[in-house]
């Protein structure tokens, strides 16, 4: 985590694409630092769509808060994430996770797995209003990561999900 955070903090962002299915501006890129490159997601605050139930311009902060909470409590579910300036202004930058393409998502997420129970608890604590199967990222080392935490930490109970069918 420390090495990834150093890379995210001190690297130079090169935007190489955009995730077109995202509701907010979500840019894919490379973070160049000390001769190496790391794939990243960059979500500039300027690209956030207003939501009726969340204050404008706070989604990136909530993404960062989810990482800090996950990291500091040992959940280890959220990829390394920081807030920093980028080509489109201040935003959230997160290490990209390569998903294990061999994992059959429907089968994986219908099983009673310790990491899914941990994620369900994590979502309840951070009051996640938007957990979907596409936000879960099982990597090639068997570790489960989760992304897209912009609508969390609301002051009202808003836990919503379409994932926890089991």
Task: Provide a role label for each language-model segment.
Residues 144-166:
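C-lobe/activation-segment region of protein kinase-like
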């Amino acid at each position: 985590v420390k090495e990834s955070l150093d890379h995210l903090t001190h690297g130079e962002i090169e935007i190489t694409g955009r995730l077109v299915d995202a509701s907010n501006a979500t840019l894919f890129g490379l973070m160049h630092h000390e001769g190496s490159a790391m794939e990243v997601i960059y979500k500039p605050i300027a690209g956030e769509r207003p939501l009726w139930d969340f204050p404008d311009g706070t989604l990136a902060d909530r993404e960062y808060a989810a990482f800090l909470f996950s990291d500091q409590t040992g959940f280890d579910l959220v990829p390394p994430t920081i807030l920093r300036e980028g080509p489109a202004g201040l935003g959230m930058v997160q290490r990209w996770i390569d998903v294990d393409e061999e994992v059959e998502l429907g089968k994986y997420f219908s099983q009673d797995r310790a990491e899914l129970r941990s994620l369900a608890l994590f979502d309840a604590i951070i009051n996640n209003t938007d957990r979907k199967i596409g936000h879960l990222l099982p990597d090639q080392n068997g570790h489960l990561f989760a992304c897209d935490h912009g609508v969390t930490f609301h002051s009202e109970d808003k836990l919503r999900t379409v994932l926890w069918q089991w």
